[in-house]
Amino acid sequence: NEAVEIVGEEGSWYKINYKNSTGYVHSDYIQVGTGGVSNGNLSGGTTSVSGAISNSEAYNIVFNAMKEQVGAPYVWGGSGEYLTTNSLNELKLRFPEDAAYGEYIHAENYVNQGYRAFDCSGLMQWGFAQAGISIGRTTYSQINAGVEVQLSSVQPGDLLFSADLGHVGMYIGDNQWIESSYTGDYVRISNVPWSYVSRARRVLN
């Protein structure tokens, strides 16, 4: 265990300073010491954390987890569950209108083959969760995660959103992002369509 400084709290997540970096760690990984958290109130003291990671380490975890899913089919409502006959049927029951519209026809070709199911925000939620970071399930939740940054200042790990909040991907540098794009397509790394992107949020800060 190593000592870290708690600087904030959001639900079951602590915002901490660790090795000159700031990030979020779930309370399950925090062991409170003297001058740390007392009776649920923050005192700004130090405590210890098991497995705390820096922002750069968190980004590597998130990026590598998402990169491993490149080629997985886009599935409306998918949030990282394995794409099986049962899971696809459950999605069809949850989203009957989308199923009737044909949203799941493409995905049916990939069931029971070891693929995970992702829509755009599902990929982001799942990827960040691999580093213990909660950003919410939908684009409408994720647009409130972290802090707003200018598009001219984006850095790897930032979330990029379309103007209507209908799509989200993660910037990975060199004008590229990783996304689960749309029905009939796949998780992929591609050039950022900057004319389509209107907002950015920095979760790793």
Segments and roles (model prediction):
Residues 40-121, 126-131, 178-180:
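N-terminal capping segments
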Residues 2, 157-158:
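Structural motif
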Residues 1-30:
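SH3/SH3-like beta-barrel superfamily modules
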Residues 12, 73-81, 135-141:
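Surface-exposed patches in mature extracellular/periplasmic domains of secreted proteins
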Residues 18, 162, 203:
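Active-site beta-strand termini and strand-to-loop segments that position acidic
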Residues 30-68, 133-152, 166-167, 172-205:
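Aromatic- and glycine-rich peptidoglycan recognition patches
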Residues 6, 161-162, 179:
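A generic structural signal for residues embedded in beta-strands
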Residues 116, 152-153:
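Residue "hotspots" at secondary-structure boundaries inside conserved domains
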